[in-house]
């Protein structure tokens, strides 16, 4: 039902998510933000069960911020991804597992940009591009065909738009609006939302 996508460039990570909050087959709102700011240069994108997403993402968010307050410096994207994975794995083995799928995007002065893919079974992988949701089946082949490690920001936005247009054409569900953000050495920046007219209007 939901869709997340991330594209890593040479000095940035571009991410996008749909804005639909749904309950079963009913759309509850169309301006829901599925991105959570972990720190100045780390963003967590989270989809899954409605209650689990917010509860788990905010739990990780507060712990990452607590780490900075205690130690005086922020976690790197790699450290934040491994911390998130460990918590998700621990909850998976408890009576209250979280059913969430995640993308973690960030920038580190030493490691550069990083994009991590994590599923509800706590499998973690560093990837040059990633997507979650049914839409991933339709768009991963496009990313595989057109992605290059040196892709410019303009070309990455074009590639993102190409993926979202494919969703509008082939995905049976209506995902009309997408939040877009970019993470680089200067932090997290909002880009213009990408919107599509509703089918048949």
Swiss-Prot record:
> What is one GO cellular-component annotation here?
proteasome core complex, beta-subunit complex
Question: Does the entry feature the keyword Acetylation, yes or no?
Answer: yes
Q: Where in the cell is it found?
A: Cytoplasm; Nucleus
Name the Pfam families for this protein.
Proteasome (PF00227)
What is the designated name of this protein? Proteasome subunit beta type-2
Assembly and oligomerization: The 26S proteasome consists of a 20S proteasome core and two 19S regulatory subunits. The 20S proteasome core is a barrel-shaped complex made of 28 subunits that are arranged in four stacked rings. The two outer rings are each formed by seven alpha subunits, and the two inner rings are formed by seven beta subunits. The proteolytic activity is exerted by three beta-subunits PSMB5, PSMB6 and PSMB7.
SUPFAM superfamilies xref list:
N-terminal nucleophile aminohydrolases (Ntn hydrolases)
Family per similarity comment: Belongs to the peptidase T1B family.
- The protein's superkingdom reads Eukaryota
Residues bearing N-acetylmethionine are 1
Q: What InterPro entries does the record point to?
A: Ntn_hydrolases_N, Proteasome_beta2, Proteasome_bsu_CS, Proteasome_sua/b, Proteasome_suB-type
What the protein does?
Non-catalytic component of the 20S core proteasome complex involved in the proteolytic degradation of most intracellular proteins. This complex plays numerous essential roles within the cell by associating with different regulatory particles. Associated with two 19S regulatory particles, forms the 26S proteasome and thus participates in the ATP-dependent degradation of ubiquitinated proteins.
Where does the protein principally reside?
A: cytoplasm
**Keywords, A to Z?**
Acetylation, Cytoplasm, Nucleus, Proteasome
Any one GO biological process: proteasome-mediated ubiquitin-dependent protein catabolic process
């Amino acid at each position: 039902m939901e869709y997340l996508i991330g594209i890593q460039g040479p000095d940035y990570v571009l991410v996008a998510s749909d804005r639909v909050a749904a309950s079963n087959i009913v759309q509850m709102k169309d301006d829901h933000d599925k991105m959570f700011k972990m720190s100045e240069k780390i963003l967590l994108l989270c989809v899954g069960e409605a209650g689990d997403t917010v509860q788990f993402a905010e739990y990780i968010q507060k712990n990452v911020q607590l780490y900075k307050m205690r130690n005086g410096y922020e976690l790197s994207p790699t450290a934040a991804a491994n911390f998130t994975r460990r918590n998700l794995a621990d909850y998976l083995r408890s009576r209250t597992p979280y059913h969430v799928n995640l993308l973690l995007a960030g920038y580190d002065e030493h490691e550069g940009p990083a994009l991590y893919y994590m599923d509800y079974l706590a499998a973690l992988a560093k990837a040059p591009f990633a997507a979650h949701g049914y839409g991933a089946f339709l768009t991963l082949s496009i990313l595989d065909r057109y992605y290059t490690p040196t892709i410019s920001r303009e070309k990455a936005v074009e590639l993102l738009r190409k993926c979202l247009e494919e969703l509008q054409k082939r995905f049976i569900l209506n995902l009309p609006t997408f939040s877009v953000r970019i993470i680089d050495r200067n932090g997290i920046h909002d880009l213009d939302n990408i919107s599509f007219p509703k089918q048949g209007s």
